[in-house]
Design a protein with these regions (language model features):
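GNAT-family acyltransferases
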Residues: 1-115, 128-132, 136, 142-145, ...
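Structured interaction and signal-relay segments at domain junctions
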Residues: 160
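Conserved beta-strand-loop-alpha-helix junction that forms the acyl-donor binding cleft
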Residues: 144-154
């Protein structure tokens, strides 16, 4: 499988159907989901279907940036699955209206196993994805959203150069969201 990119400690590659059990295990951790919301799917088949839908939308779509999609994050030395990153047109986000996203904006997101927290993996991978996305003509800004209480996530955004750009009310969430942006 083609590798999207490597950083000093990470290898990012497109998610494959073989990653479905890894995603299910990641989403089974209530602490991982505490500030994120519901899991991507509720069954192994649901995760497989989620991954399969990424290919026509991002990975096999000639009109899509080669950077867009959901990427498995693996430790380079060991190959251990740590979590994932997403990079996609911001208009693909389910709360696009509430987040005030616009055409040309690219959303970055990430989700990691607890064992990978606090080690700089999210920052390392996100910085590289942000750097590469800003090189594309179609990108006007990098955007991201987190619940205000999720300081670990907002610190990653800040380390990538994004700045807080306002509060967001997300349907179904008791906590307030915050929008971050890095204009090109």
């Amino acid at each position: 499988m083609a590798i999207l990119l490597q950083t000093p400690r990470l290898r990012l590659r497109p998610l494959t159907p073989e990653d479905a059990p890894r995603l299910a295990a990641l989403d089974a951790d209530t602490d991982v989901l505490r500030y994120i919301g519901p899991p991507i799917a509720t069954s192994l088949q649901g995760y497989e279907e989620f991954i399969a839908a990424l290919y026509p939308k991002y990975f096999d779509n000639k009109d899509s940036s080669p950077l867009y999609g959901f990427w498995a994050a693996e430790e380079r030395e060991t190959g251990v699955f740590l979590g994932w990153f997403l990079l996609r047109p911001a208009l693909d986000y389910r709360f696009v209206a509430e987040a005030r996203y616009e055409a040309g904006q690219v959303e970055i997101g990430y989700r990691f196993h607890q064992a990978a927290w606090g080690k700089g993996y999210a920052t390392e991978g996100a910085q590289e994805l942000v750097r590469r996305a800003l090189l594309e003509d179609r990108t006007s800004a990098i955007v991201s959203l987190a619940l205000v209480e999720n300081r670990a996530s907002t610190r990653v955004m800040e380390k990538c150069g994004l700045v807080r750009d306002g509060d967001v009310v997300l349907p179904g969430y008791a906590m307030r969201g915050v929008r971050y942006v890095l204009w090109k």
